[in-house]
Amino acid sequence: MSEIFDVNAAIYPFPARPVPLDTNEKAFYREKIKTLLKQRDAVLVAHYYTDPEIQALAEETGGCVADSLEMARFGNNHPASTLLVAGVRFMGETAKILNPEKKVLMPTLNAECSLDLGCPVDEFTAFCDSHPDRTVVVYANTSAAVKAKADWVVTSSIAVELIEHLDSLGEKIIWAPDRHLGSYVQKKSGADVLCWQGACIVHDEFKTQALARMKALYPDAAVLVHPESPQAVVDMADAVGSTSQLIQAAKTLPQKTLIVATDRGIFYKMQQACPDKELFEAPTAGEGATCRSCAHCPWMAMNGLRAIAEGLEQGGGMHEIHVDEELRQQALIPLNRMLDFANQLKLQVKGNA
């Protein structure tokens, strides 16, 4: 696999951690959110990586907890006129692309994603223009503007199948933005993949030596790894997959102890799926290294109860997602192409992001 344009050196400033709420404040905001959801004809859709109390509230109020694409599709099928998306900004954009007639609000428009930040549209356009013979495949974790430049949008659970399909047609691929997922897909498919060099700041921190030491402490444990992790970590896995695939693996694997290499937000739904199993976070530091994310996306952490209440209450420019209509139409083409491909394969598209 060819690899150029290394953006790995970028250090993204993390947002300030939300001020913790006490028990009374949490109860106050939960009730306020429930009231505002009814008043605004809104539904709360939360990503697997948000904090457990947010996921619980989404389920309690008739919303959903899912990956970014399923969040958008749930919103499309739900009768509510407003979607409150608890996640990061590209997830709100995806919801708006697929639901243009609905108002899409977010707790904050400043919730970024290192994969999105690491693939700016102008640089990516120039990169694609310099390789006009290649089919452009971008991960769901990208801006609407980058999606609009792509031939295909893809989620992690369908990535290998799609690249195998394109390879069978003799097509050469540009893959963006995650280099680890790109490497994984190339290794599984054998396709000619030219990979953009972005990375998820959470998954990029998982360490092989520290994981090996943890595995030695729990020799009977199964290791579950998201493919946005480094290849050496993926090679240690008993199961590799997207968020929904890892939850399914946790249910079906015979081991009662699981070491999980993805954002710890997934533990809420994973523990629901297998309450009899013991879950451990895979280590993100060791051998003299320190972690920055420490297995939890700092931008996902911005989706607190107070911020959700403010998003519903204030709406407007500080919270509403807007996507230019021409751009939306362009981004919708590769998204629909992926959905059609998945339906043909009779796959349920459940990605990460």
Curated annotation (Swiss-Prot):
Name where it mostly resides: cytoplasm
Q: Which domain of life is it from?
A: Bacteria
Is Acyltransferase tagged as a keyword? no
* Location in the cell: Cytoplasm
**Pathway annotation from the record:** Cofactor biosynthesis; NAD(+) biosynthesis; quinolinate from iminoaspartate: step 1/1
What cellular-component terms does GO give this entry? cytosol
Molecular function via GO: 4 iron, 4 sulfur cluster binding; metal ion binding; quinolinate synthetase A activity
Q: Which residues bind [4Fe-4S] cluster?
A: 113, 200, 297
Q: What does this protein do?
A: Catalyzes the condensation of iminoaspartate with dihydroxyacetone phosphate to form quinolinate.
- Report the family membership: Belongs to the quinolinate synthase family. Type 1 subfamily.
Protein name as it appears in the record: Quinolinate synthase
Q: By which gene is this protein encoded?
A: nadA
